[in-house]
């Protein structure tokens, strides 16, 4: 992947960026780019080695009352209680630097921390997006599956890689830090200064008919990498998972128990898991 980004910030907390990007996704023996064509009951397959796209992305960001702490290398926002709004649109151009498709892809994001005084705070992330054109599955909206045992923001701990494909979605990521609301009432535990954490993540998704390839005649699309196509897109029920955990163990450790709430009957999935995080917070 190669990209060039120009960013402009204004004093009214508004900024925009323009990105030129060329990206190539290469097939492997595990994830193949296969097209099929059936004639007179005989199905033939052709395989592409890669998928190339060239696109322009325009992004808008508005963060009222945002403040930063900055050093020589980077900067960090110190006002998470104020909202951040993001809006971006990608336009793909066929025929430029090997690009094979024309397409449009729109994304929206909202970030904010809600304080509840002595009852802690909740970090809220709301996102939505849509791919407007017919495109092969590497260019669809694929949820971020966390395949590790660590806690990762904006990812799903119990979702398999490429388990669901979407061309439109709406998602949420809620993390409630209770600030010792319950554990501080237990005398011996109170001295440890442990902190309770509850997470709730989920996604509504949809894959339109134009982006659902026929296994016997895919046309310009690729076959999905799984034989069971019901595994590849969400129904009316959203994907959801919930987690409960304890943070500030030995001042650096957080441990979560995560449980998958929906689509629990699919083959090869994890219904629950343990995730950890190491980090020092000030």
What are these model-derived regions, one by one?
Residues 1-282:
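Exposed, low-structure sequence patches enriched in small/polar residues
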């Amino acid at each position: 992947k190669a990209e060039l980004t120009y960013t402009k910030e204004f004093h009214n907390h508004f900024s925009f960026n323009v990105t030129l990007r060329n990206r190539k996704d290469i097939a492997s023996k595990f994830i193949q780019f296969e097209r099929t064509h059936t004639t007179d009951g005989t199905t033939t397959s052709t395989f592409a080695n890669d998928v190339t796209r060239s696109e322009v992305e325009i992004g808008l960001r508005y963060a009222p009352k945002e403040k930063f702490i900055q050093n020589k290398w980077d900067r960090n926002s110190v006002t998470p209680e104020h909202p951040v709004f993001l809006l971006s649109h990608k336009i793909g151009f066929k025929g430029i630097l090997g690009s094979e498709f024309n397409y449009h892809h729109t994304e929206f994001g909202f970030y904010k921390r809600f304080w509840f005084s002595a009852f802690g705070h909740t970090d809220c992330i709301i996102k939505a997006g849509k791919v407007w054109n017919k495109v092969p599955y590497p260019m669809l909206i694929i949820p971020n599956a966390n395949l590790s045992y660590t806690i990762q923001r904006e990812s799903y701990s119990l979702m398999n890689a490429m388990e669901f494909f979407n061309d439109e979605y709406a998602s949420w990521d809620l993390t409630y830090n209770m600030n010792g609301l319950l554990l501080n009432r237990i005398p011996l535990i109170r001295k440890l200064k442990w902190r309770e954490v509850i997470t709730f993540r989920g996604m509504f998704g949809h894959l339109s008919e134009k982006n659902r390839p026929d296994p016997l005649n895919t046309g310009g699309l690729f076959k999905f990498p799984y034989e069971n196509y019901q595994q590849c897109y969400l129904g009316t029920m959203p994907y959801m998972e919930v987690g409960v955990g304890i943070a500030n163990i030995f001042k650096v450790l957080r441990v979560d128990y995560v449980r998958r709430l929906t689509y629990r009957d699919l083959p090869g999935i994890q219904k629950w898991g343990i995730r950890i995080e190491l980090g020092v917070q000030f």
